[in-house]
């Protein structure tokens, strides 16, 4: 009986500890709002702290509803990294409970703000451009994402990714100064890797630079400008519902008139929607994944993400 009581007390104590902090085993982590930020953070925090992504694959940063367990993860994190309130408005309130030195809003960094693109901004002087025709007609008014004055898809900019990596390095150095050598080495490796990767992507994309295309999400401006691609514009289409006959006619007319080579959807689009858009034209259809769903977080994941995106462009435009 005595043995049983002792076991019961131990079990109750263990339960109390878990209730006090259900994430006590993984409390010291770098937590990012979305997967691509996790790619950058994982490269810098490699061998220092684990990196976790708050949003599950398939969830939208525009309208995610935090669970109590998510709030706990934010509070127990060593560092929280997000784009900023224009992209992840749902984080603004819970992050008031997190110390300022334990969070980074990347879009607000002094090193990043000069690199921000205005919404719908493209480099019109870019060679090979035939102009950008933006189609804003909607099948679903909630489907187009506006982030205010600036394009907030900043993880698609290698230049901003580099500044993000430096900021993450510097903050982790403040929080864990004992890891200086490892953090310094990680940052040097990331910067070298990024520079080499950019050279490879320039070579890969050169043959398709003058080929026009449309997208279903106005997210890619940073990547397109950086690598000299030729977007013709974007259509706003509900990923779940096939557009009506009149809308399809409008889209197909633009595809043909502007001599588009390809129209790109994203992983959340149903195949029937994608097929319906390009049907009856010679325009190919492809898929771009701006969040890198399925790419494992490790020290190579950001460059793997950029390479995957480049391959997705080339596979449809070549």
Swiss-Prot record:
SUPFAM superfamilies in the cross-refs: Helical backbone' metal receptor (SSF53807)
Q: Where is the signal peptide?
A: 1-28
User: In its UniProt record, which GO terms are filed under biological process?
Assistant: zinc ion transport
CDD domains the record matches: ZnuA
Q: Which Pfam families match?
A: ZnuA
> What disulfide bonds does the UniProt entry report for this chain?
262-316
The ranges of region (Disordered) come to 121-146
Out of the domains of life, which is the source?
A: Bacteria
Q: What is its main location?
A: periplasm
Q: Where is the composition biased (Basic and acidic residues)?
A: 129-146
Q: What InterPro entries does this protein map onto?
A: Bact_metal-bind_prot9, ZnuA, ZnuA-like
Example GO molecular function: metal ion binding
Q: Where are the transmembrane segments?
A: none
Cellular compartments per GO CC: periplasmic space
Residues that hold Zn(2+) according to the record? 62, 153, 217, 289
Compartments where found = Periplasm
Print the keywords alphabetically. Answer: Disulfide bond, Ion transport, Metal-binding, Periplasm, Signal, Transport, Zinc, Zinc transport
Query: What function is annotated for this protein?
Result: Part of the ATP-binding cassette (ABC) transport system ZnuABC involved in zinc import. Binds zinc with high affinity and specificity and delivers it to the membrane permease for translocation into the cytoplasm.
Q: Which family does it belong to?
A: Belongs to the bacterial solute-binding protein 9 family.
- Specify the protein name: High-affinity zinc uptake system protein ZnuA
What lineage, starting at the top, does this entry show? Bacteria, Pseudomonadati, Pseudomonadota, Gammaproteobacteria, Enterobacterales
This protein's encoding gene: znuA
């Amino acid at each position: 009986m005595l043995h049983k009581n002792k076991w019961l007390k131990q079990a109750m104590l263990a339960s109390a500890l878990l209730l006090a902090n259900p994430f006590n085993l993984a409390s010291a982590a770098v937590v990012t709002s979305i997967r691509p930020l996790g790619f950058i953070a994982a490269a810098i925090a490699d061998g220092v702290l684990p990196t976790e992504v708050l949003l599950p694959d398939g969830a939208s940063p525009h309208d995610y509803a935090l669970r109590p367990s998510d709030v706990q993860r934010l509070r127990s994190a060593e560092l929280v990294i997000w784009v900023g309130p224009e992209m992840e408005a749902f984080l603004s309130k819970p992050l008031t409970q997190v110390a300022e030195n334990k969070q980074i809003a990347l879009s607000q960094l002094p090193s990043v703000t000069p690199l921000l693109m205005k919404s719908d901004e493209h480099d019109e002087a870019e060679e090979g451009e035939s102009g950008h025709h933006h189609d804003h007609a909607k099948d679903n008014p909630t489907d187009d994402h506006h982030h205010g004055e600036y394009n907030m898809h900043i993880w698609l900019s290698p230049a901003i990714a580099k500044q993000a990596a430096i900021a993450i390095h510097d903050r982790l150095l403040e929080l864990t100064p004992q890891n200086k050598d490892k953090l310094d080495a990680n940052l040097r490796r990331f910067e070298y890797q990024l520079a080499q990767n950019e050279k490879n992507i320039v070579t890969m994309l050169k043959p398709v630079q003058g080929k026009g295309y449309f997208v279903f999400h106005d997210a890619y401006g940073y990547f397109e400008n950086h690598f000299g691609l030729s977007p013709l514009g974007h259509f706003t289409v509900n990923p779940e519902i096939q557009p009506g006959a009149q809308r399809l006619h409008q889209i197909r007319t633009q595809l043909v008139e502007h001599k588009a080579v390809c129209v790109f959807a994203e992983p959340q689009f149903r195949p029937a929607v994608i097929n319906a858009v390009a049907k009856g034209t010679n325009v190919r259809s492809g898929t771009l994944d701006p969040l890198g769903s399925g790419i494992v977080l490790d020290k190579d994941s950001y460059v793997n993400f950029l390479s995957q995106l480049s391959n997705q462009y080339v596979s449809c435009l070549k």
